């Protein structure tokens, strides 16, 4: 540090070095300057060559040296066009270990990412992006990905008789019909049933198995997974992952409910327009937000069928104890 605000950081690509969680694959050095809005990369040194790219925002957990202890727990990356993009690292387990930052990200869809935000996204050096959406959702809003990321489709709701996301989007265009169809608690009841299906549907079990096996390969990290708004299918995947890592249940819910902090403000115009056209606010927030009762339903389904998260992984997802332990060794330190 020259002035208490500038720091040298290494390997902004993530990695598995146990002594430096979140650092690894160290192929460059960067001068990071602390600004009022957070740390930014200034001149980047690539193999001894100064690359004057200008300021690029980065997360403080990438800094090799920090002037104070910073706890990055399920933090947002602050990418405005992808508001629910968050790092799943930083959570502490019941036995005191911590999930590594920079390896696994949860997100909403990437179809509307801006060019400037794509540059920031590219700095994550993603290897895989897992899309949990239905075919109709993917066709309506095709994926936009960084060049480094391989696109993997995992249609969790393929076996659902009627995939709720497509139906709900149509109803949102007609507030009067939405009131009749989804009022009096019907919207919440529909989501509760969907969350049970995340556990019980054959397609959900198949695709969540593929997801967890995919993120258990260190060579395929960092990785990102998402659905449409990054709260329901993504929410259960994140909750199951954190629970398997032995993160306390209250912290699992804390991470899950954070979607309300990012998605509802991002959809404020949609919500206001729906209500102005005669729609019930409780309906639209039930659709676009998350409720504790939704995740309760998924956990209830999991526990009533399998008893424990370990049994859910072993019996529903066919991921045995050895493979579960491998996941923990990758993500925990």
For each feature predicted by the language model, list its residue ranges.
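Histidine-centered active-site/metal-ligand motif
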Residues: 1, 226
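Binuclear metal-dependent phosphoesterase catalytic core
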Residues: 2-66
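Extracytoplasmic/secreted cell-surface and envelope-processing proteins
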Residues: 18, 51-52, 138-141, 235
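Cys-dependent protein tyrosine phosphatase-like superfamily
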Residues: 60-224, 237-333
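Ser/Thr-glycine-rich phosphate-binding loops at phosphate-binding pockets of nucleotides
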Residues: 229, 233-234
């Amino acid at each position: 540090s020259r002035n208490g605000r500038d720091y040298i950081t290494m390997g902004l690509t993530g990695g598995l070095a146990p002594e430096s969680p979140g650092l690894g694959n160290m192929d460059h050095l960067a001068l990071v300057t602390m600004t009022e809005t957070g740390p930014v990369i200034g001149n980047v040194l690539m193999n001894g060559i100064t690359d004057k790219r200008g300021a690029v925002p980065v997360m403080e957990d990438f800094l090799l040296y920090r002037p104070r202890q910073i706890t990055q727990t399920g933090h947002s990356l602050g990418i405005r066009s992808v508001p629910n993009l968050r790092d799943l690292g930083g959570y502490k387990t019941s036995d005191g270990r911590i999930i590594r930052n920079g390896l696994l990200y949860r997100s909403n869809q990437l179809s509307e990412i801006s060019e400037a935000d794509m540059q920031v996204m590219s700095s994550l050096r993603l290897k895989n992006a897992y899309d949990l959406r239905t075919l109709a959702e993917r066709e309506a809003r095709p994926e936009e990905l960084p060049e480094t990321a391989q696109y993997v489709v995992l249609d969790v709701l393929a076996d659902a008789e009627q995939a709720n996301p497509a139906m709900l989007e149509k109803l949102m265009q007609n507030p009067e019909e939405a009131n009749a169809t989804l009022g009096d608690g019907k919207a919440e009841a529909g989501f509760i049933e969907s969350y049970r299906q995340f556990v019980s549907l054959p397609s959900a079990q198949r695709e969540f198995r593929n997801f967890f096996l995919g993120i258990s390969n260190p060579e395929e990290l960092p990785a990102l997974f998402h659905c449409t708004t990054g709260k329901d299918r993504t929410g259960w995947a994140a909750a199951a992952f954190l629970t398997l890592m032995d993160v306390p249940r209250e912290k699992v819910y804390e991470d899950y409910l954070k979607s309300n902090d990012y998605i509802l403000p991002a959809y404020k115009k949609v919500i206001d327009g729906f209500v102005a056209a005669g729609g019930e606010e409780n309906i639209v927030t039930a659709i676009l937000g998350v409720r504790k009762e939704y995740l309760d339903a998924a956990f209830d389904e999991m526990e009533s069928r399998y008893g424990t998260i370990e049994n859910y992984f072993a019996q529903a997802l066919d991921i045995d104890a050895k493979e579960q332990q491998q996941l923990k060794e990758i993500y925990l330190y």
